[in-house]
């Protein structure tokens, strides 16, 4: 894997980590690569029922979210905000809410950014590319290059003072511009 911009992570403290979502491998790869930041990802509750994978993400302290129940989803957002304020852990989310099969950025669910706003923590904006090829390349015994780019860290003061919808549009714009630059 290649990591670009790791120096853009906050020098200290925890944060909300956001990324585009291309593959089921994304959270495990990002959790492994950035293990020292103790990122607990939010994942759809159905993933916790997948044999072996569900056990793995549970052990990695991932948090289930019920995407079909807004009240329960907000409980997960509040739990994640408490995790940021009460522990040294960071939280990771995919604001698109699902994998993009076309490798294009899907519309954001801006509510997940409330995790950082409620906790008063910075947001680390990133992109991941290449994970969509892992399964196909494994079957052909080919190496897959995965690139993770840290685009920007939005400081906590700006996170708290900006409307959630504006923050969402800004983050989506950063990610979309980066992903479009990388298209062949």
Predicted regions mapped to residue ranges:
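A broad, low-specificity signal marking well-ordered, structured residues that form hydrophobic/aromatic
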Residues: 1, 39, 146-148
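Membrane-anchoring hydrophobic helices of lipid-metabolizing enzymes
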Residues: 1-15
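Generic beta-structure capping elements
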Residues: 6, 20, 33, 44, ...
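Short secondary-structure boundary/capping segments
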Residues: 7-9, 31-32, 54-55, 82-83, ...
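Catalytic core of membrane glycerolipid acyltransferases/transacylases, capturing the structured
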Residues: 11-70
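Non-catalytic C-terminal accessory region of glycerolipid acyltransferases
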Residues: 74-184
